[in-house]
Amino acid sequence: MKLLSVNVGKPRPNPWKGLSATGIDKRPVDGPVAVAAPGPKGTGAVGLAGDRVYDVKHHGGTDQAVYSYAREDLDGWEAELGRPLVNGVFGENLTTAGLDVNGALIGERWRIGPDVVLEISCARIPCATFEGWLERDGWMRRFMQAARPGAYLRVIEPGDISADDPVEIVHRPDHDVTVALVFRAMTREPELLPRLLIADALPEEDKNLVRRRTTA
């Protein structure tokens, strides 16, 4: 299990969401990249040095510090879409190999390289920017049907990471709430929502959303 690439975004115009810019255009970088907890959502800060987000209402902050997607899932989408998908094209900071990102448990911890420890926090929910960026009508619906969302992570221990660093799972919590389960519950299968609250590491924002939806 390893990192294939560490990807950092460059600002691009965002005509799809009425914002001045988007950071979804992430490209692999050479050499070490510093990773640190960015603080609360709302500033545009994220976990990787040199990266940022512009939709500060929905992205960034402690619980969405880093976004990871598996190369194996990108390869699957390449076959389905009939086009090459380079590392970073889904807006992911970390492109991994040998990890079941969607099967990771909320609260699972990964050590990357010698120093950095990240914790799985939640699933990526697609937006209009993602659909516009890929230039595929109906992409959000297709992405949701596949339930291969990739994972957001929070920073537990800071440090530097680089492409080809090993990734080790150092903790798996005692529950069955995976990234894919969270995604399915939040999008197409609301009957699964009550199962999510057993995951202590789920962001408070998501827990509150679950409570509202299940008590309405």
Residue positions per predicted region:
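Loop/turn positions that initiate beta-strands
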Residues: 107, 158, 162-164
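A short pocket-lining beta-strand/turn micro-motif at the edge of beta-sheets
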Residues: 31, 149-151, 163-165
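Conserved binding-pocket/active-site segment within a compact domain
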Residues: 125-131, 135-138, 144-145, 158
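Electropositive, beta-rich accessory/interaction domains or terminal extensions
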Residues: 1-131, 171, 175-216
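Short, basic/aromatic beta-hairpin or loop at an interaction surface
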Residues: 83-91, 136-149
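Short amphipathic alpha-helix initiation/capping segments at coil-to-helix junctions
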Residues: 154-160, 175
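Short alpha-helix capping/helix-loop boundary micro-motifs
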Residues: 96-98, 150-156
